[in-house]
Amino acid sequence: MLTKFETKSNRVKGLSFHPKRPWILASLHSGVIQLWDYRMGTLIDRFDEHEGPVRGVHFHNSQPLFVSGGDDYKIKVWNYKTHRCLFTLLGHLDYIRTVQFHHENPWIVSASDDQTIRIWNWQSRTCISVLTGHNHYVMCASFHPKEDLVVSASLDQTVRVWDIGALKKKSASPADDLMRFSQMNSDLFGGVDAIVKYVLEGHDRGVNWASFHPTLPLIVSGADDRQVKLWRMNETKAWEVDTLRGHMNNVSSVMFHAKQDIIVSNSEDKSIRVWDATKRTGIQTFRREHDRFWILAVHPEINLLAAGHDNGMIVFKLERERPAFALSGDSLFYAKDRFLRYYEYSTQKDSQVIPIRRPGTPSLNQSPRTLSYSPTENAVLICSDLDGGSYELYIIPKDSVGRSDVVQDAKRGTGGSAVFIARNRFAVLEKSTSQVLVKNLKNEVVKKSSLPIPTDAIFYAGTGNLLCRSEDKVVIFDLQQRLVLGELQTPFVRYVVWSNDMESVALLSKHTIIIASKKLVLQCTLHETIRVKSGAWDDNGVFIYTTLNHIKYCLPNGDSGIIRTLDVPIYITKVSGNTIFCLDRDGKNRAITINATEYIFKLALLRKKYDHVMSMIKNSQLCGQAMIAYLQQKGFPEVALHFVEDERIRFNLALESGNISVAVASATEINEKDHWYRLGVEALRQGNSRIVEFAYQQTKNFERLSFLYLITGNLDKLSKLMKIAEVKNNVMGQFHNALYLGDVKERVKILENAGHLPLAYITASVHGLTDIAERLAIELGDNVPSLPEGKTPSLLMPPSPIMCGGDWPLLRVMKGIFEGGLESANRGAVDEEEEDVEGDWGEGLDKFDVDGMENTDIEAILDGAEAGEEEDDEEGGWGLDLDLPPELDTPKASANARSSTFVTPPQGMPVSQIWSQKSSLAAEQAAAGSFDTAMRLLHRQLGIKNFAPLKSMFLDLFSGSHSYLRAFSSSPVVPLAIERGWSESSSPNVRGPPALVFDFSQLEAKLKSGYKATTAGKLSEALRVFLSILQTIPLVVVESRREVDEVKELVIIVKEYVLGLQLELKRREMKDDPVRQQELAAYFTHCKLQTPHLRLAYFSAMTVCYKSKNMATAAHFARSLLDTNPTIESQARTARQVMQAAERNMTDATTLNYDFRNPFVICGSTYVPIYKGQKDVACPYCTARFVPSQEGNICSVCDLAVIGADASGLLCSASQVR
């Protein structure tokens, strides 16, 4: 049994499969009807209008309807699309056992405990016939799939077959009173429209179920006498064919399988039994421990069954439907219907090759599981689960393709798996011993090899190599050298798919796809909520795979997406261009055409084939929010711009890609304050002051505009802005602008007009405007404020602008392919808008709408000032001074024009970038400023995930490898890279590695200080020193292999000290728990410390145990202490005294979790011993050991790495990567 779906609920009494959709109805003893999607495993809906148990339920085969019958005597017809009951049919006088729709007519048949069967017309909502004759509860009634017959089963120990042919001749909807009267009579006494054709007697107790065969004139029944009976009928009679015995309790339900010659029954004995309908013998039995079975349902189209029991229901298959196949170049070999078949992709020709199983062999769940093909020897290995695992070897004659009469005796053997590993060699797995037998084509063993892990399946992994699968990992094993070439932790792998060049492999689990290299180096992992069924590599290195309901793709970086949906599951065999070749569950070859544009586009982006990307943008119909979001997420907003017409999205993408011109055009179309504000922020970031000015004008942000004019030295526009503030009666704005301009008279005037005469007087007096000050003093009279004495006034004037700046100078670079590629298509619209906008920027102040004034009044103010300026220019006559308007300061030169202006040379590659590209050491990446690369390297090499302790070290490395040269105040600081080992004779064209602030000698000095602190008993300080060393080591670089070994040795030394000091500090905290104190002190002695420190540990443990009356344990520590030949006499004397005291009473007062005779390591988190033979996990960096429950947590010893993570190992020298 292959369970596909299972639910937990109240007792399930009725089940019905939907004929087309992956749905199943389950009616419960609690009165609820559940609608489940068994493919997705989700509850779609529930219907709960019945009162009491619902025993019967059935889907209509074409309408969105289902019918239910319950213990409330009601039959309800429901519409599952509208989620409501359409109507209720009343007439039965007792519990309703089953209900069923007719396959053609608008009829429903129902069976009831009132000893009748009723046939209803659900369109006219009336009962059209009552079938009476049973004299006990009618447990079941169903229509024949083709003929006008009904079969019923009753507790009166009979099965009856009814002829309902006369019903078709009557009107389904009675109209007049006479017909209503006859209807009432038929309700009471039974009508003549349905007559009993056969009464089948043979059961000794009540019959619970009877059903027709879908095509043959057979009936099967199950009863309380624990028997299943098979009946045959013809036009005149029906008779018993055979009795199937085996159930130990009442048989609840029994049915014929829709596709195979088998009978399935279930019983209250908690079992489901499968019987061969031809041989009438039992084939398989499936049992549950606590659940009695009550109902069966068979899917009318596909190989699915369902069974309801006391605590829910299960949907299951009896055997696998995945065909076994093997690909070889342009051809496919696959097994179907006891034949090996051959399919050629180019011609799509399908033919039989040879028979592969003798007729008469039991076939249930013993079909071929895997198939392996050797093209050189034209040999096929077929594996199945027969006899616990077996294989058959066939040599295909060259002239047998297309012929199916060539019979040969296969060479057979037992084994869990069998695959070809060379031209004329194949490997067979012996599961019990985890051995591989290498055999030749004569089926003779030529070699035996033990596998490195307990293996339950083997797969081909290249010539002479095997991929071995265990429960939680896979390894690649070289049979010749007996070496493990690669290992990878995975969920349970079901299928293995190699790429065409054997460089990549896809490992398919139930819900996971793992892409790895040929050495099992992980590339990406993909998780699916729906079961993964198959997959194949296309020509571009993209993995195409199927789930139950989708064809999907997986790119090399792990990005995935849906190509198309599926109606039924398929098994991909090959992908060629836009065609997917696959096998369906019937073993038929199919070719499906797909649209590969989306994943080819993403692959081109991933591989940086930008010319290909541009070509696809121009020629393909790529669109959709998902594509835009993908491009944005992957850092290509400038590409996404080409797919977007919505101005708001275009604006966001333009800002993200820094495309100011497109952003201006979109902001002009949108014309909202928030968008202008964001445009101003981005333009300010780019130093484009003209667009910043324009954006501030559009938002009427006078304060920011004033400050912009101040910092760019544009005093003319600042004075115009002051006039506008005066017109708007904005006193604060006017005063600010006067302050920025240094216009004292204007400030005095503003203060006077605002009524602040004392402030105006002080301002005038301080700045030496005596005439104005005297006039104001007269107006103030006796209230003239006095100026402070004894202080020398200083003039507060803003500095005069030396450079009236425009936009920041930018390096001239070539336009990117995505910016210039579509210029011809988009130039017209965008450039026209841009030119219009640029024309307005020079005198953009005209745009303001001032409260209380017309635009023409403001323009008059501003135009007056400009007219005066123009007159002044004209008075110059024919002078050589030419004042150009701002718009013409930097004219646009034509493409071919020669310019005399200085063009900044293109910037070379920064040294930090050279460092980053050349180095694979994390410390040098951090020194180059590539922190993210450094973190990725540390994560891959050492499994480090917690980078907080390394943050300050990263910053130290970066700042220590750079120096900064300051020049003039107006010029930027010049960064200089400091190289390791630089000398005056070094070549200027060769860049050395960065200088590093951490080296191995520093760590050795720190180690000595840590030893000193430990000896002095300053344990907290010592722990801090050792932990600092442990966290610095990943960022140390050494030169030679010998130094690499010393660094690795230092990691172990420091790890032992950190763990030991943590144990001792923890012990000192636990003053209220003497048992735990003794345990921690005992564990401390098992840390590998220097001899002086080990003596201190022994002495401490001896003292603690002696005080707690654990004399035997104390004596052990005293003996260990004396074995180290202590140099301090007091320690030796105390140890001898303890041993003398212990000899008188060699017992322990308390039991400790400590056994010094059994070797162990200490868990670095829970501080408990992990004895030899127990499972543990390790920190990939410091190698500290932990109990398995700590896997996935941050290591508590080094505080850096993830416990149990995969890591390649410490890389601290360039010599390791040469």
Swiss-Prot record:
The keyword Protein transport applies. Its main location: cytoplasm. It comes from the Eukaryota. Signal peptide: none annotated. The keyword Transmembrane does not apply. Keywords: Cytoplasm, Cytoplasmic vesicle, ER-Golgi transport, Golgi apparatus, Membrane, Protein transport, Repeat, Transport, WD repeat. One of its GO terms (biological process) is intracellular protein transport. WD repeats lie at residues 7-48, 49-88, 91-132, 133-172, 202-241, 246-285, 288-326, 363-404. It holds the Pfam family TPR_COPA_B. GO terms for molecular function: structural molecule activity. Disulfide bonds: none annotated. Residues 831-843 have a biased composition (Acidic residues). It is a peripheral membrane protein. Residues 826-849 are annotated as: Disordered. It is found in: Cytoplasm; Golgi apparatus membrane; Cytoplasmic vesicle, COPI-coated vesicle membrane. GO terms for cellular component: COPI vesicle coat; Golgi membrane; mitochondrion. InterPro entries: Beta-prop_COPA/B_2nd (IPR006692), Coatomer_alpha_WD-assoc_reg (IPR047312), Coatomer_asu (IPR016391), Coatomer_asu_C (IPR010714), Coatomer_complex_subunit (IPR050844), G-protein_beta_WD-40_rep (IPR020472), Haem_d1_sf (IPR011048), TPR_COPA_B (IPR056176). Oligomeric complex that consists of at least the alpha, beta, beta', gamma, delta, epsilon and zeta subunits. PANTHER family: COATOMER, COATOMER SUBUNIT ALPHA-2. The coatomer is a cytosolic protein complex that binds to dilysine motifs and reversibly associates with Golgi non-clathrin-coated vesicles, which further mediate biosynthetic protein transport from the ER, via the Golgi up to the trans Golgi network. Coatomer complex is required for budding from Golgi membranes, and is essential for the retrograde Golgi-to-ER transport of dilysine-tagged proteins. This is Coatomer subunit alpha-2. It comes from Arabidopsis thaliana.
